[in-house]
């Protein structure tokens, strides 16, 4: 069975409600919304939302702010947040534009990254889950293969690394961890900044954060961190507190 909840001829108010919920704005609009048998399990239903754009729209590409007419389109699908207990997918024709140099580029859509397979809202849920559980557990929780979860995680970690700034770090903690044998990693964290309040009590005014993680537990691990620390505007001379368990490799560093 196929249940049509909304089509181009449906009540505008119904369409507006779903557009607001999804954050869809002109020139994008919801073309159809239906419940269909799941592609993974035909005995279950899933929601399919088709989004389209107004014909004749020019789309912006790049930082210049210039807009270009649509060259062609490619159909893409993203998994969205569940609609109650039903899986929800968004499908859209994604425009490509031809630049003055002849290159054809895919424009960004407001609800998802190109090549992700998940909407930005769904990626937010994934990132929240992996903060509290293993990736394999998170994958089972949402019913996806863990390789998809790893791709989302790796992308956002790389983006976060680009924004690292160690200029305010004046305390560092070092520790090593192992998993299943002697496969060690070394973790470097910042100490929280502590101030003395008006009543003479010590109070933390910042939270500790992970600065760097690397394989091994030797002098080379510390040297790799030091290189990254300087690269991200860290000043070794400004570090007045450093703590570690003082294993041999760390003492040598």
Predicted regions and their residues:
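Short, conserved DNA-binding cores of transcription-related domains
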Residues: 1-107
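Short, positively charged, Gly/Tyr-enriched micro-motifs
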Residues: 1-3, 63, 71-172, 176-183, ...
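Exposed alpha-helical structural elements
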Residues: 13-17, 125, 148, 221-224
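Structured core elements
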Residues: 48-50, 98, 173, 187, ...
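A short, sequence-level motif marking secondary-structure junctions
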Residues: 54, 112, 216-220
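RNase H-like nuclease fold core
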Residues: 150-241, 248-253
């Amino acid at each position: 069975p196929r249940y049509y909840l909304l089509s181009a001829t449906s009540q505008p108010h119904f369409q507006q409600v779903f557009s607001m919920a999804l954050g869809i704005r002109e020139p994008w609009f919801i073309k159809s919304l239906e419940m269909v048998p799941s592609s993974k399990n035909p005995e279950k239903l899933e929601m399919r939302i088709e989004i389209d754009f107004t014909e004749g729209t020019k789309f912006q590409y790049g930082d210049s702010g210039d807009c270009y007419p649509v060259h062609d389109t490619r159909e893409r699908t993203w998994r969205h947040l569940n609609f109650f207990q039903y899986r929800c997918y968004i499908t859209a024709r994604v425009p490509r534009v031809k630049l003055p140099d002849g290159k054809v580029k895919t424009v960004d859509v407001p609800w998802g990254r190109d090549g992700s397979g998940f909407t930005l809202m769904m990626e937010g849920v994934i990132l929240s889950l992996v903060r509290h559980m293993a990736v394999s557990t998170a994958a089972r929780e949402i019913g996806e293969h863990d390789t998809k979860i790893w791709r989302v995680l790796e992308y956002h970690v790389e983006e976060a690394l680009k924004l690292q700034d160690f200029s305010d770090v004046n305390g560092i903690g070092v520790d090593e961890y192992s998993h299943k044998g002697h496969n060690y990693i070394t973790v470097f964290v910042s100490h929280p900044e502590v101030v003395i309040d008006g009543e003479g009590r010590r109070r933390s005014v910042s939270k500790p954060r992970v600065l760097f993680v690397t394989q091994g537990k030797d002098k080379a691990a510390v040297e790799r961190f030091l290189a990254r620390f300087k690269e991200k505007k860290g000043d070794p001379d400004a570090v007045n507190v450093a703590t570690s368990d003082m294993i041999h490799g760390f003492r040598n560093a």
